[in-house]
Amino acid sequence: MKFVFDESAWEDYLWWQTQDRKVLKRINMLLQEIARDGNEGRGKPEPLKHGFHGYWFRRITDEHRLVYKVVEDEIRVAACRYHYGR
């Protein structure tokens, strides 16, 4: 599987590298699980609704979500900070 980050998601990911290594470690663990198991596993994966067809989210923390979509051999990461479209 190949990871493809939206520009804002990549900025979020880089932000975590300087702000909270523990959260960054959790994001990396969730990404590994997505690559291995798709839409099952930790972080309570759930599909997004209301116009976000095909996108899923997992809980990183109580405040932050990892939003992604699995397309063939790619995992497209849309966000990894805050809730959904914030």
Regions found by a protein language model. Give the residues of each.
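Short glycine- and Lys/Arg-enriched binding-loop motifs that mark or flank ligand-binding interfaces
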Residues: D37, P47-H50
